[in-house]
Amino acid sequence: MVGVADPAAAPRIAEVLRLLGTERAFVVHGEGLDELPLDGTGVLYDVSPDEVARREIDAQALGLSRASTSALAGGDPATNASLLEAVLRGESGARRDVVVLNAGAALLAAGRTETLESGIELAALTIDAGLASELLGRLRAEKRRADAAVAAAPQPQGASA
């Protein structure tokens, strides 16, 4: 799934992906964002080797809350990490809704579900079961191990840290 903020660029990128022989991909944008929005209609370009199909996505029609882009605003990296952790711990609200909407679309693009609705449901269940938070913890642990391995690796002759 590729997010594109520029509505004019999104169909062009989708067509390039098709021409490159992409098996399945989604190019999404909405209301100036590089993701599907909660405050209006988002657009999803469904890319396959044969075509690019344009689909409008209305989050409210999918049972999600309506929220302005400003209500979803984050901040610096530490703030954004904290906001994501809260969603992955099960906090409800607009931030969770935008996460499950976009994760649901990614699950559909990856062939894990048959419909966007079932993708949203699977994303929500994954959060509610604690699996998303658990995965984030495993990714962090793996990053720490990789960082330690890099730091412990011998430096090439003449290299400076």
Where are these regions (language model features)?
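Glycine-rich anion-binding loops and their surrounding alpha/beta cores
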Residues: 1-161
